[in-house]
Regions:
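Central helical "cap/lid" subdomain
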Residues: 1-28, 90-93
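A residue-level signal for beta-strand positions that form part of recognition/binding surfaces
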Residues: 15, 38, 55, 123-124
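Anionic-ligand binding region
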Residues: 25-58, 66-68
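Alpha-helical elements of Rossmann-like donor-binding domains used by nucleotide-donor carbohydrate transfer enzymes
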Residues: 36, 40, 79, 83, ...
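FAD-binding beta-loop-beta segment adjacent to the flavin cofactor pocket
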Residues: 45-53, 97-126, 130-132
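Flavin-binding catalytic cores
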Residues: 50-55, 60-104
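A conserved FAD-binding loop/helix module that cradles the flavin
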Residues: 118, 123, 128-154
Length: 154
């Protein structure tokens, strides 16, 4: 089924993880702005049972990620960190640690448009969010469809 996979496309996502000195009042817990270079920002330390460090995760937009995908992690962090500080209204002096990660195939941009593929003998299945769309529900629906097919419920 390799031929079926040729049309599936993915966008990369460059991600910054930063530990900051605790902020008195963070300006937000999460922020989404698809038109910004930092399309998604979250206060990871807002989750229950976390330490006192202010830990933030920022994900770049697909366009920004494509532009800088081949940069090394240090360069990516050096570019993204000032943007995060700007969005949080802080200076770099608040930063204790920062690192970047490249997800080359982070988000499906052109899904398969069916819940799964399998070989003709139905002994090998492939599924996931890449089959139906870039959301958790797509991954769940894909897995559920595979299970139903195996059980003969489809």
């Amino acid at each position: 089924f390799a031929g079926e996979l040729e049309g599936v496309g993915f966008d990369p996502c460059l991600t910054l993880m930063a530990a900051l000195k605790p902020l008195c009042t963070p300006p937000f817990v999460t922020r989404t702005d698809v038109d910004d270079a930092l399309a998604w920002i979250a206060d990871d330390s807002s989750k229950p049972d976390r330490g006192t460090e202010a830990c933030w995760v920022a994900q770049a937009s697909p366009a920004w990620s494509v532009k800088y995908l081949n940069s090394d992690s240090e360069a990516i962090a050096a570019m993204m960190l000032p943007m995060l500080c700007d969005r949080l209204g802080i200076t770099n002096a608040k930063v204790r640690y920062a690192t970047a990660h490249r997800w080359r195939y982070a988000k499906v941009s052109q899904p398969l448009e069916k819940p799964f593929i399998c070989n003709t003998s139905r002994t090998l299945y492939a599924g996931g969010d890449w089959c139906l769309g870039a959301r958790l529900e797509a991954a769940w629906t894909s897995g559920d469809s595979i299970a139903r097919d195996i059980l003969g419920l489809a």
